[in-house]
A protein has these predicted regions:
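Short alpha-helix capping/helix-loop boundary micro-motifs
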Residues: 23-28
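SH3/SH3-like beta-barrel superfamily modules
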Residues: 30-68
Length: 68
């Protein structure tokens, strides 16, 4: 995992999208967010040839969502 870019913003999903605890194609899916859901992210990461945004969940766990 690269160190990521400390960048923040909000992103609205255009399709049902997996949420993972690590930014990896092979990481298990923790749950799904639906099209139209908005993510307030605080980090961007490039891993496995993909771009991921990341946020800290209400439970304190860092989550990753692939955005490309």
């Amino acid at each position: 995992i690269d160190g990521g870019i400390a960048e923040s913003g909000s992103y609205t999903l255009t399709k049902r999208t997996a949420v993972k605890n690590t930014p990896s194609d092979t990481a298990p899916v923790e749950f799904y967010l639906e099209a139209g859901d908005k993510i307030n992210f605080d980090l961007k990461v490039t891993q496995d040839g993909h771009s991921w945004i990341s946020y800290i969940s209400y439970s304190g766990v860092r989550r990753y969502v692939q955005v490309d």
